[in-house]
């Protein structure tokens, strides 16, 4: 089961990096960030497919999408100076709570 969570963590991180590179790629006009988008999302889906050998689909996908959304938001706020208002923060906290509850033993 631990290896499944390792695969899932890699999937979440690579998906978030791919999403961040979408912004940097300027509509796929810049080739290096565009290549990182393809690599990030390809690695994310490959790792997610490996995760499914160890963790059920419902738990894997919900965790991947929820944690990926949270991490992508953190990247947007920290590196791209995007705003996060009170409603957005509450939404992120609810997503995090849901991910924790889903994975609680």
Curated annotation (Swiss-Prot):
Compartment annotation: Cell membrane
GO biological process, one term: transmembrane transport
Coiled coil spans: none
Membrane topology: Multi-pass membrane protein
Disulfide feature: none
GO cellular component: plasma membrane
InterPro entries: Small_drug/metabolite_transptr (IPR000390), Small_multidrug_res (IPR045324)
Assigned protein family: Belongs to the drug/metabolite transporter (DMT) superfamily. Small multidrug resistance (SMR) (TC 2.A.7.1) family. EbrA/EbrB subfamily.
PANTHER family xref list: MULTIDRUG TRANSPORTER EMRE (PTHR30561:SF1), SMR FAMILY PROTON-DEPENDENT DRUG EFFLUX TRANSPORTER SUGE (PTHR30561)
Biological function: Part of a multidrug efflux pump. Confers resistance to cationic lipophilic dyes such as ethidium bromide, acriflavine, pyronine Y and safranin O. The efflux is probably coupled to an influx of protons.
Protein name, as recorded: Multidrug resistance protein EbrA
Species of the source: Bacillus subtilis (strain 168)
């Amino acid at each position: 089961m631990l290896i499944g969570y390792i695969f899932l963590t890699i999937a979440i991180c690579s998906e978030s990096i791919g999403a961040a590179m979408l912004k940097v790629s300027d509509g796929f006009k810049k080739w290096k960030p565009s290549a990182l988008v393809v690599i990030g999302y390809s690695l994310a889906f490959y790792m997610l497919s490996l995760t499914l050998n160890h963790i059920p689909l419902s738990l894997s996908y919900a965790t991947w999408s929820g944690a990926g959304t949270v991490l992508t938001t953190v990247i947007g706020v920290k590196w791209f100076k995007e705003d996060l208002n009170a409603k957005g923060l509450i939404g992120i906290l609810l997503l995090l709570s849901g991910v924790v509850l889903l994975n609680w033993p």
